[in-house]
């Protein structure tokens, strides 16, 4: 079928070897992209591709265009990955995919921690990390065809972690992973989606103003209140949604007060007292642990061992948590009651620590309500 020279028999611009690729495509579940009957008289069910995409350069299932390659075309690959997933051994390292505004961009990847980089774009970009979305150059208008220049999509089955925007005002949207999103210059609109997401800035925290805003969103006939943030620096204002971490040049800010950030400061208050709950280094260590998958219970246990050592005396445990909660020495009756529960195995020191961390008094001690408005700095 192929002697390596490409000088092989053809008919109607079809190399005979392409017939096998075409028929293998059918066997794998691909259909014709056009409405006209095949030579056997069969008509593919809709939807169909536009004429500009009904070409062999985009799909081997087309009858149009000269077929010069012995491999599936971009739309074939996207459809097959939707059906069967991505080959995990291909592009399995930490790969950087550079956005090309002169060509279409079909992103597919087998593994690793990967990045889409649009920093060299001469125009703003609108890019989504979730598979199947239609990204494009510009902010408000996309080409009708995903195969047009500057269009970008992540194929189904591919997970991309990081995204770098252009030097203009971009719209960047993450996926369900823990994303790192870099808007670069301009006034960007950034939405992290699910996961613990980080936005990186190229200026110091002291040079930025953080303003929380309330937005109203309609969903299933109901109106939801959504919190967003504006990060103002110089003449640029970034609007961010569903972002848990802000990384400045000199420090970081955690915004998820109802998530891991809130858990850490409550844990530190229970273990070390309210004054130490804002220790930036301790907060950073705790966030790294929880964001990496460590449970709150395991972190509380580790923290208690750090403060009191392994297998601490039950009375010392009660005294520690009571004083950090109330601010005074525990009464003997309290010490007796809870130390006996610990000694009898009916209450663990970790359980007591969690109860103290989640107590309303702890929330008041660390001004948890106020932290919702400012975020929590850490290093």
Residue spans for each PLM region:
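Short, solvent-exposed loop/turn segments at the edges of secondary structure
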Residues: 1, 53-58, 75, 158, ...
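Glycine- and aspartate-rich repeat motifs characteristic of hemolysin/RTX-like Ca2+-binding segments
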Residues: 1-13, 64-200, 205-209, 225-232, ...
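A well-ordered secondary-structure block
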Residues: 4-6, 10, 14-20, 339-343, ...
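Short, polar/flexible loop-turn hinges at active-site or ligand-entry regions and domain interfaces
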Residues: 5-11, 34-39, 43, 67-70, ...
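The catalytic-center signature of Zn2+-dependent metalloproteases
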Residues: 14-75
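Short, composition-biased motifs enriched in small/polar/acidic residues
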Residues: 210-218
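Substrate/cofactor-recognition hotspot
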Residues: 244-379
